[in-house]
Amino acid sequence: MNDAVKLERRATRRQRQAEATQAEIVAAATRLFFERGYMATTVEAIAAEAGVALQTIYNAIGSKRAVLSRVLDFAAAGPDAPAPVPVFMARRTAEIHDAAGFARLLADWFAEVAPRVAPVFRVIREAAAVDPEAAELDRQRAAQRLRNYAEGVAAMQRRGIAAGKATDELAAAIWSIGYPETYRMLVIEQGWSAERYRSWVEASLSAVFLAARPEEVRHPE
């Protein structure tokens, strides 16, 4: 075995160890954030729960706010994620050929991801009410989701789907309909079934994608 192969294997081993350590930290932080809330959870407590040194958290992820952001990333991606969310969603979007299919894809995705991320968003929103750093994280992640939706819409429009409609307005519609708080209010608070929620998301997005713009509506003379 030559030196290059040995170095590559060592690098791969170190990367896997780093990923495993991050996963342990995120799992520990998730448990504590859910049990105690963000404000009552210290980085020291996360380190103790994860069984790692305090400095390991700062080296592997960063501040407590960064840990909370990573908790959201892990929740969104789900277990054994094949790729970051924007990457595998772009792959799924590439297989869609019409507005109905786009609405169905998003409805399937929101129904899949909402149960995982809604509890994390509750932690973020509660923390944002009293902590400036958590509030900034909330704003940043909201803006990031809106940008991701706009990129997805633009990609579909380049293929002639929902073309002629305002990209930012369609992205805003996806953002609001698929917002985790909407899931929480309908499913957790109002008792909707998961299938009813998914069907509502699909119908709502289909109506948005297929609706005519105001200047396209013809009034009878």
Residue ranges of predicted features:
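N-terminal intrinsically disordered/low-complexity leader segments
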Residues: 1-20, 213-221
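Helix-turn-helix
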Residues: 24, 28-66, 70
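Ligand-binding pocket scaffold of soluble enzyme catalytic domains
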Residues: 44-45, 56, 60, 64, ...
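Amphipathic alpha-helical packing segments from all-alpha helical-bundle domains
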Residues: 108-125, 132-159, 168-172, 199, ...
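Hydrophobic/aromatic-rich alpha-helical bundle segments in the mid-to-C-terminal region
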Residues: 156-204, 212-221
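Short helix-capping/turn signature of helix-turn-helix
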Residues: 38, 126-131, 177
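Hydrophobic alpha-helical connector segments
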Residues: 64-66, 70, 80-115, 171
